[in-house]
Regions:
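Phosphate/NTP-binding elements of NTP-utilizing enzymes
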Residues: 1-169
Length: 169
């Protein structure tokens, strides 16, 4: 199945292709921040089997009403095995997962249990810095995502680029 990726503005394209560990995309209402984050998430979740991602927002009803709605507009239904809105978990047919989290009641003990490959915090300005740092520390804790063989063939020194010595992901 082909996934069509469209960019509404140059900033979306820069964000989508960025290889930096932490990315921020700011701007006015309706400029496509959530949309491009969801596009990028679908690509990561479907490319790497077993990939784990957390989508967060301060309040769950806002996450469900906005971010989740945008994600499911973009992600083809054929990729989804199960989605439990009440539990906040989406499982893909390739074993990848999304944890849908509200951060207004997040505590350190709960956050320490997450092992994820990446994190999207929608409306990050609503989130306390201490919670952001706690969630950010969980990124990279899950090492069971499977790198597709064509990528390994193309980049045999994965995850390091032989010229730059930098991580490719």
């Amino acid at each position: 199945m082909d996934l069509r990726i469209d960019f509404r503005n140059p900033e979306q394209e820069i964000f989508f292709w960025s290889r930096k560990r932490n990315n921020r995309f700011g701007g006015g209402f309706g400029n496509g921040k959530t949309y491009v984050a969801c596009q990028r998430a679908v690509v990561m979740l479907t490319t790497f089997s077993g990939y784990r991602m957390a989508f967060c927002r301060q309040v769950y009803k806002n996450l469900r009403a906005t971010t989740m709605q945008t994600f499911f507009k973009i992600c083809p239904k054929e990729f989804i095995l199960t989605h439990d809105e009440n539990f906040g978990l989406t499982v893909f047919i390739n074993g990848s997962r999304i944890y849908w989290l509200h951060l207004d009641q997040m505590d350190e003990a709960t956050a320490k249990g997450f092992e994820i490959n990446s994190l999207v915090i929608d409306q990050a300005e609503e989130v306390e810095e201490s919670i952001f740092l706690l969630m950010d520390a969980r990124v990279g804790r899950w090492d069971k995502a499977i790198v597709p063989q064509p990528l390994l063939d193309q980049f045999p020194e994965w995850p390091r680029h032989k010229v730059y010595g930098q991580p490719l992901v």
